[in-house]
Amino acid sequence: MGKYIGESVLRKEDPRLVTGEAKYLEDIQLSGMVHAVVKRSDYAHAKIKNIDTSEAEKVPGVIGVWTGKDFEDMNPMPCAWQAGGVDNNANTPRVLEIDKVTFTGQGVAVVVAEDRNIAEDASSKIVVDYEELPTVVSAEEAIKPGAPQLHENAPNNICMEWECGNQEGTELSLIHI
């Protein structure tokens, strides 16, 4: 085999990790640096009825608290490319969702503060009122008739159908296996 394939490789980073000499992102402190913490959804699929940031805004050291409505006029983030020139119905999520969350952990608000602990404390004070919606947890269930619709622009929860290569030739060659 090659130099690394199938062989144990000596890790070079272990000595500095076990001796406490490694530098982590938390160790970096720059002048004027601020910290952001994103408030994330506890639900896999839910309507956002209201977001109350008033208590978070009162925490000393908080620079600002924003929700998706503050960025409503900004373009959503593209999350897919046109595979092989095929049109797709891929959802383009926003940095912070405004009306509906479609996965657990989706960002709904952000707190910027003087340090990370303050930002985390303030984030915990944001109250989000959700209306939970039905969910599915597998692709097979998601495309069945009557399954909860995640994105309106992807009927039957199908973003796109794409084939490439020689399907007929591949199917014929499988007969001989």
Q: Which residues does each predicted region cover?
A:
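Conserved small/polar residues in nucleotide/adenosyl-binding loops
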Residues: 31, 175-177
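Flexible, low-hydrophobicity surface segments
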Residues: 1-169
